[in-house]
Amino acid sequence: MADKNFLTEIIDADLAEGKISEIHTRFPPEPNGYLHIGSAKAIYINWSIANQYGGKFNLRLDDTNPAREGEEYVNSIIEDLHWLGADPNGGIFYGSDYFDKCYEYAEKLILEGKAYVDDLTRDEMREYRGADAGKPSRPSPWRDRTPEENLDLFRRMRAGEFQEGEKTLRAKIDLASPNMNMRDPAIYRIKYAEHHRQGNKWCIYPMYDFAHPIQDAIEGITHSMCSLEFENHRPLYNWVIENIFGTEFPKQREFARLNMTNTVMSKRYLRELVEMGIVDGWDDPRMPTLCGLRRRGYTPTSNFTFVREAGISKSDNLIDMRQLEACIRSELDLTAQRRIAVLDPVKLVVDNYPADKTEFFDVANNPNREANDASTRKVAFTRELWIESEDFAEVPPPKFKRLTIGGEVRLMGAYIVKCESVEKNPDGSIAAIHCSADLETGNGNPADGRKVKGTIHWVSADHAVDAEVRLYDKLFTEANMNAIPEGSDYKDYLNPESVVVRKGCKLEESLKDAKPGEKFQFVRTGFFTPDSKNPGVYNRVVTLRDSFKPAK
C-alpha cells in the first residue's frame, strides 16, 4: 500500500534528512478493557506505516496501573491484533518489563535536581498547580528539597514506608508554563495493588507520561503516533526524552480519534453496559468492540477499509456507522454464498404435488457476476413449504407483487404457483396457504407466455433447519453521543430495538453444517453468520441494502 498523509510526510522528511534510517512504530493499549473500532484506527496507522516503509511494528501492553489491568484484557488484545492480521513483527512487550529502568531514570532525575518528592495531597497539588481557571500556580513547600533528601524519600516510598497519596515524585520543570502538563507533573505515585505480572514487587508505579517515552526509547521507536488528546502532552514527552536520553527521537505525533455515530467508545461506559447486563458481554454484537464486531460477522478487511476511508487527519470528525456497514456489505456481496431462510414462516401446501415426492433444484451459490462463482447447490422441493408471512396478503395493498388469493408467483428457482385457498386456525390466523403449481415451469417460463411479476423464497418443510435469528441494529438512538446534554444519562439514549429476536425460523438444509465465522446472504433478507456462542443462532451482520452512499 502507499497511503500518504501528514504523518508519512513527517516520516519522509526525517528519512530524507538522514535523521533516521528505518521506521519503528508501536501500538500501546492499556490492558484494562477490550479494543474497539477506534482502536483499529490506531492499530492500522502504526502497523500500515511500518509495513509501508519496511519497518517494525511493536505491540506494547501498557500495564503501568495495577488496579485496573489483567490477563483477560491482555489475551483479548493479542487475539484482536492477530485477527486483524496486524501481527507485531517487532515483538510483544509489556510496560511493566521496564519498571526497573523507569525507577533508575527517576533516581537520575532526582540526583540532577530535576525531580522532587512532594507531600501535597492530590487536591492540594491541583490547587498549587493552578488547575482551576484563572488561578496562578505556586511552588510546593517541598519543591526545594535537596537531591539527597529526595533520593532518601523516594527509596523509602519504594520500601513501602508511606501510605497511598502521602508522597508523590514530581518532575521539576516550569510552574509558569501555559501548558498544565509542564507544571511539575507527577511522575511516580504510591499504589498498593498486586500487579498481574509483577505481583507485589512494587508499591510505586510510574505515571503514563513518564513511562511512555521511556518505553518508546528503550524499544527503539522512531515515531510514537497517538491520538489528538495527547497533543498537549508532547512537550512533556520531549522533556523526558531530552533529559534522560539526550536525543531527538522518539518523536511523538498526533492524529484525530475515530468517532462513530450511534455508539460510545468510552471504556467506562462500555464496562458499565457489560456489568449492568445491558449487553451480553464485551463481545455482544451490538458493541463497537473488535470482539463484538467479529461475533457479529464483520471482517478484518471491512474494518481496515472503513478506517482507511475515514482518513487520517488532525481534525476530529464523526463518521456515520453506515459507512462501516457499507464496507462489510460490499465485501460480503462478493464473498458470501447465498442461502434461503424464512424468518417469519407460514406454511404453503402445493396440493397438486405428490406428498411422497422430493426433487432437487440447482440454485446458484453467488449469482453476482463479479464474484466469479459458477457453483450451485441442491435445494429440496416438497409438497409442503415454508414462505415468509409478509409474502402473502389476503387483501393486498396497491402494487403488491407477491402471493394473493387467485394470484401467481414464482417460487425462487422452482415452480410458478397459484393461491387457491387459505386454511385458518380457530383464532383466525393462517394455518396454511393452499396452492397449485404449474409443473411445466420448473425449468423455465410458462408455455403460454404469461408473465408472473413476483418471486418469493421458500424452504422445504420436510428438510428445514430450525434456528433463532437475531436482527441487530444501532445500540443508541442518538447519532452523536459525544454531544448529548451535559448531566444527561447516556443510557437514556439506548435503542430499545437494538436487537430483535426471531425464534422458529426455517433455514434450508445446507445450513445445518454452517460454522461460526462463515458468512451467508439470506436471499432477500440480509447477511448473516452463525453465532460463536450459541449453536442454532444466526446474527445479522448487516441489512441487504441501505440508502447510504459512502463518500468517494
Residue ranges and their predicted role:
Residues 3-12, 16-79, 196-227:
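N-terminal catalytic cores of NTP/NDP-binding nucleotidyl/phosphoryl-transfer enzymes
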Residues 16-19, 48-56, 82-89, 217, ...:
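Secondary-structure transition/capping motifs at alpha-helix termini
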Residues 28-32, 60-68, 91-100, 123-124, ...:
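Conserved short loop/turn motifs at secondary-structure junctions
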Residues 63-65, 71, 108-270, 328, ...:
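Active-site cores that bind ATP or allylic diphosphates and position pyrophosphate for catalysis
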Residues 73-100, 105-106, 113-116:
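A glycine-rich helix N-cap at a beta->alpha junction
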Residues 230-234, 238-240, 304, 308-311, ...:
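Core subunits and conserved enzymes of cellular information-processing
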Residues 250-327, 331:
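Long, charged, mostly alpha-helical binding arms that flank functional sites
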